[in-house]
A protein has these predicted regions:
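Extended, hydrophobic alpha-helical segments in both membrane/secreted and soluble proteins
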Residues: 37, 50, 57-66, 87-91, ...
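Inter-Walker segment of RecA-like/P-loop motor cores
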Residues: 96-149
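Conserved RecA-like ASCE P-loop NTPase motor core of nucleic-acid helicases/translocases
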Residues: 54-56, 61-62, 66-96, 103-106
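Conserved helicase motor core of SF1/SF2 NTP-dependent helicases
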Residues: 73-76, 83-84, 98, 134, ...
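Pre-ATPase regulatory/linker segments immediately N-terminal to the P-loop/RecA-like helicase/translocase core
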Residues: 1-39, 93-97, 105, 110-122, ...
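Switch/connector loops and helix/strand junctions flanking conserved nucleotide-binding motifs
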Residues: 88-90, 111-116, 212-216
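N-terminal pre-P-loop "Q-motif" helix
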Residues: 25-49, 53, 61, 145
Length: 228
């Protein structure tokens, strides 16, 4: 996927060219203190980084407001990704609170029961045929998944174009887990010329490159708390 991607996308992912910015892009919504962040994310035509320590609202406000602004375009489609199922559950909870319809890629084993109705595999059971499934996918504007789940269902990127990917907790994700997704594309031939379209137009990476995972060095005996 990466090797056959367009030179422009390969150069971007390999840091061989600078990302482009379109300052003519203006906000359609009002996001209070997050207006500057959302505006800069919208103006970024390739990639945008959101960096901040834990508890600064990167997911609760940053991700959600960037998503809401993107959805002001009635034809825009967005995929929301993270490394762990727990992080995707958190994203799903924010979408439910905001009454944003979405589909989740994955299985019931890895999904909080509160969001099982949003699983594509469950929603597809109500579809009578393959055409109905295709219509469900085409008519849904927001998708959620772990990077592993989307990599396992990479064919989704062959049948649906996403204008934006927002990747939460991206500092936890190794490059090989992402590069195939960000380089995914479809190829068509027009007038004897090969035309390549990126499956994901722009992407926003959210995370904290200084954040370390929790490490427990105590034994279970030392960590045990007994009732007085």
């Amino acid at each position: 996927s990466f090797l056959s991607a367009s030179k422009e996308r390969r150069d971007l992912l390999l840091c061989q060219r600078e990302p482009t910015i379109d300052e003519s892009q203006k906000l359609c919504g009002d996001y209070g203190s997050f207006n500057t962040l959302v505006a800069r994310a919208k103006q970024a035509r390739d990639i945008f980084l959101v960096i901040g320590p834990p508890g600064t609202g990167k997911t609760s406000f940053g991700l959600l407001n960037i998503l809401k602004e993107e959805l002001t375009n009635p034809t825009a489609n967005v995929v929301l990704l993270s490394y762990t199922n727990r992080a995707v559950d958190e994203i799903c909870s924010k979408l439910v609170e905001s009454n944003i319809d979405f589909l989740r890629i994955g299985s019931e084993l890895n999904c909080d029961k509160a969001f099982s109705d949003h699983l594509l595999c469950n929603r597809a059971k109500d579809c009578r045929n393959a055409r109905a499934v295709s219509e469900l996918i085409a008519n849904t504007r927001v998708f959620c998944a772990t990077t592993s789940a989307l990599n396992a269902n990479i064919h989704l990127l062959k049948i649906k174009h996403f204008d934006l990917a927002i990747i939460d907790e991206s500092s936890q994700i190794l490059e090989p887990h992402l590069i195939g997704l960000l380089a995914a594309h479809t190829s068509t031939t027009q007038n004897s010329q090969l035309k390549i379209q990126n499956s994901i137009g722009r992407f926003v990476l959210i995370g904290d490159h200084k954040q370390l995972p929790a490490v427990v060095q105590q034994t279970a005996e030392e960590s045990r708390v007994d009732e007085p």
